[in-house]
Amino acid sequence: MRSHYCGDVNKSHVGQEVTLVGWVNRSRDLGGVVFLDLRDREGLIQVVYDPDLPEVFNVASTLRAEFCVQVKGLVRARPDSQVNGQMKTGEIEVLGQALTIINAADPLPLSMDNYQNNSEEQRLKYRYLDLRRPEMAQRLIFRAKVTSSVRRFLDSNGFLDIETPILTKATPEGARDYLVPSRTYKGQFFALPQSPQLFKQLLMMSGFDRYYQIVKCFRDEDLRADRQPEFTQIDIETSFMSSEQVMAKTEEMMRGLFLEMLNVDLGEFPRMTYNEAMRRFGSDKPDLRNPLELVDIADLLKEVEFAVFSGPANDEEGRVAALRIPGGAALSRKQIDDYTKFVGIYGAKGLAWMKINDLSLGLEGIQSPVLKFLNESIVNEIVSRTGAQTGDIILFGADQATVVAESMGALRLKAGEDFNLLQGEWRPLWVVDFPMFEKINGNFHAVHHPFTAPRGVTAAELEANPANRVSDAYDMVLNGCELGGGSVRIHNQEMQSAVFRILGITDEEAKEKFGFLLEALRYGTPPHAGLAFGLDRIIMLMTGASSIRDVMAFPKTTTAACPLTNAPGFANPQQLAELGIAVVEKAVKTED
C-alpha cells in the first residue's frame, strides 16, 4: 500500500511518484488549494491538492483530522520562500494525484494539537490516539532501537537470551507480590516475579555462564512518577566474573548505548562509596550535576548551649550538617519557611539558617536566629568549611543521621533546581560498598536482597557482627537516578543460611521458601554476579520524558488501573468458584 514512509521522503525523490499512507495531521484550504499534512510513525509530509483534478480535490476537501488515507502523487521541491526548516521533509512536498479514504474518523475525544489540555486519564483511555502524536511515537521507536542495541552488545559478548518463568513462587524482595490462584491446587497461588533473581542464579549453576533477558517484572507497590506495577528490566548474570569485571562490562554497554543513540560520550564512570555519597549528598544515588554538598559540623557544636544542635552532636546516631546555597541570602523569610515545611515532609523538626550578608564585617555581617548560641570561632569555622561567601545562606539540619540525610539531601536537590545550579547534562557514577544490612524497628533487613554476598568475611564472622559488614554490591547512577543495581551473589550454602538467620528467617522457613536454592548450592555452584537495569527509567532519562508512563506503550495510572481496558475488573463468579475463591466484601460501619 505504500512506497515510502512519510518522514523518509526527501530532495533525492524529487520527480518521483510515491504512494504514502497515514493519518491526516492537519488539513487546510488556502485560496482554493488544499494543503494536507500527512503523518505516519516516521514523520510528516505536506501534500498539495489543486482544482485541476476536481474529483481528487473534492475528496481532499472533506478530510478531517485523523482520517486514515492513501495518497499517490509526485514529489516536488518547495519554493525557497516556502521551505520549512522545522520539518524533516520541509524542503519538498507531494503534488497529490490520487486520494483514497481508508477509514474516516469521528470527532476526536481529545486534542491532538494541544495535548497539554488532555487529562492523564483521557490520554490513557484513548492511548491509541495519544501514541499517534509524533513525540510519543518517537519515544517508542527510540525504545525499540535501545533494546536492539542492548541485544547486539550482549549477543556479541557471549551472553545468551534465556527466558525464565512468569508463574513462580513468592519470595521476600521488599514489595508485595501479584498473586495468581491455581485452579488445580485449590487454595494455592503462583506469584508474578518481582525479578528473575533466583532463576538467573540457577542458570549460572546450570553452566550457562552468561545470561541476559529483557523481561517484564511485577511489583504491587505504591506508585509514583518513576514506578509502575509492571516494568521492564535488562537482566544480566555472569559466572566467574568479579564485581569489577561486571561493572566494566556493563559500563561499556551503557557508554556505547549513549554514544550510539545520543552521540554523547559519558566518559569513564567515577566510583563513590555508599558512606561518602550519604555524607556528602544525603543520598545513595547522588545527582552530581548539582554542586551543593552537605558538610558535617557536629564536632563544633557539642558544647553549645542550644540543644537542637548539641543534642544530635553528642548522639552517636545523630548528625548536624550544613548546606551552603550560593546567593541564598536573598531568600525571604517566607521562602525560608517554605523550605522548613519542605524538610518537615522528611521528618525534620525544623531548619536553622545563617545569612552571610557581608563577610567583611565579621559577626556584624551575619544574620541568624541561632547566632547568639555560637561564638565567633565556631561561626568562622562553619563559614570556612562550607566555603560561604557574601550573599550566601547556610542551612542546618540537626537530628538523627538518617533524618538529616533524607531531609537535607532532598533540600539539596530542591535548592539546586530553585537556584538553577545544575551543571552539565550527564553525570554518571558507580556507588559501591553498600552495607549488607540495615536495621528497621530493631530487625535486620537486606539493603539489596538476601542473595547478595558480603565482602571479605566468612559466614561465622558475618553472623558475629552483621551490623558493620559491607556487601559486594554496586549501583549505576545517572543524574540522581538509579539506572541499575547488582552484586556478587552468595555461592555457598553456609553463607546463604547465615544471611537467612540474620534476617530472622528460620532454618525451617528457609527450607520451605528456598529449599531448592539451598540444595542447588550443594552441587558445585560457580561464583557468579549480575546486575539489572530499569529499561523504562533509562528511556525516560534519554528522551527527557517526565514520567516512565510516557515511554511505555500501555502504562497504568498512579492507582495501578488501565482506563483503556478498565482493568482490573471483576471476575466471573463461575471462574471464582472453579478456583475456590470467595470475594468477601468489607462491612461498612454505620452510626446510629
Curated annotation (Swiss-Prot):
L-aspartate binds at residues 173, 219, 448, 489. Its EC number is 6.1.1.12. PROSITE patterns: AA_TRNA_LIGASE_II. Its main location: cytoplasm. The gene is aspS. This is Aspartate--tRNA ligase. It is an enzyme of class 6 (ligase). Keywords: Aminoacyl-tRNA synthetase, ATP-binding, Cytoplasm, Ligase, Nucleotide-binding, Protein biosynthesis. Residues 197-200 are annotated as: Aspartate. GO terms for cellular component: cytoplasm. ATP binds at residues 219-221, 228, 482, 534-537.
